[in-house]
Amino acid sequence: MEVKSVTKYVRISPQKLRGPVDVIKGQKVEDALNLLKFMPLKAAEIIAKALSSAVANAEHNHEMDVDDLRVKNIIVDQGPTLKRFRARARGRGARILKRSSHLTVIVDATV
């Protein structure tokens, strides 16, 4: 049975979030959390939080055993972009795009 956790409007660009995602797809949940714990990236911390939420959902809502869970899929989608303005020379302005992401973590029990 698939269990998912959705984290929306995370203030990090999808490009930065996709790096650690490729490393942990298909891993056992325990191994994935250990890998994420030792990655020196902000994205790894965000993904670990979402993965822990998916595990808690599986354990509490569906009474699944945590030892049997695997990361089936992780989807990173682009969220809304905040547009900002930085003053430049000669009265001009440069646009700054502050991107956000939506993160969906799907875990599945392997038998």
UniProtKB/Swiss-Prot annotation:
Top-level taxon of origin: Bacteria
Keywords linked to the UniProt accession: Ribonucleoprotein, Ribosomal protein, RNA-binding, rRNA-binding
Cellular component aspect of the GO annotation: cytosolic large ribosomal subunit
GO molecular function terms attached to this record: rRNA binding; structural constituent of ribosome
SUPFAM superfamilies in alphabetical order: Ribosomal protein L22
Pfam family for this entry, one: Ribosomal_L22
Record family assignment: Belongs to the universal ribosomal protein uL22 family.
Role noted for this protein: This protein binds specifically to 23S rRNA; its binding is stimulated by other ribosomal proteins, e.g. L4, L17, and L20. It is important during the early stages of 50S assembly. It makes multiple contacts with different domains of the 23S rRNA in the assembled 50S subunit and ribosome.
Subunit structure: Part of the 50S ribosomal subunit.
Protein name, as recorded: Large ribosomal subunit protein uL22
Organism field: Desulforapulum autotrophicum (strain ATCC 43914 / DSM 3382 / VKM B-1955 / HRM2) (Desulfobacterium autotrophicum)
Name of the coding gene: rplV
